[in-house]
């Protein structure tokens, strides 16, 4: 399967996804078929701060179209912070989308966790991971940090 990654939002997470995918495919005896496009982190930050899910989903849809043109069969956003408009992106995407939140939620539930602590960006914490956890509850710090 040719995977399309929207990277560049958090370069460290893009690298981590690449390394883990590459190792998993190699260990399975295959070769990784992957295309990465770089998202504009400044655009993402503006849209995230403004809560403009539609504008960011449109930006992602354009990147996903590039991934599809390169032969990708699915797409993933390589940053949890970039998932604030995931549902909107799914509705505009020319490719099936892979959520980074869904496997986290499933893992927590499989481990028997009903509630998990959450650390992340202000918006991630204020929305309990954008309300995308369906099997577990998220608790985040509520105090304002100086």
Region spans (language model):
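Non-catalytic structural scaffold of enzyme domains
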Residues: 1-146
């Amino acid at each position: 399967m040719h995977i399309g990654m929207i990277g560049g939002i958090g370069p460290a997470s893009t690298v981590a996804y690449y390394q883990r995918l590459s190792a998993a495919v190699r260990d399975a005896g295959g070769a990784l078929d992957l295309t990465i496009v770089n998202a504009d982190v400044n655009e993402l930050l503006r849209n995230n701060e403004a809560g403009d899910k539609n504008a960011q989903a449109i930006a992602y849809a354009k990147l996903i179209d590039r991934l599809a043109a390169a032969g990708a069969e699915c797409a993933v956003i390589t940053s949890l912070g970039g998932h604030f408009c995931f549902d909107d992106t799914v509705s505009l995407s020319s490719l099936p989308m892979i959520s980074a939140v869904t496997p986290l939620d499933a893992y927590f539930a499989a481990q028997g966790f009903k509630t998990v602590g959450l650390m992340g960006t202000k918006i991630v914490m204020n929305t309990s991971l954008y309300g995308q956890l369906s099997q577990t509850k998220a608790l985040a710090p509520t105090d304002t940090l100086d």
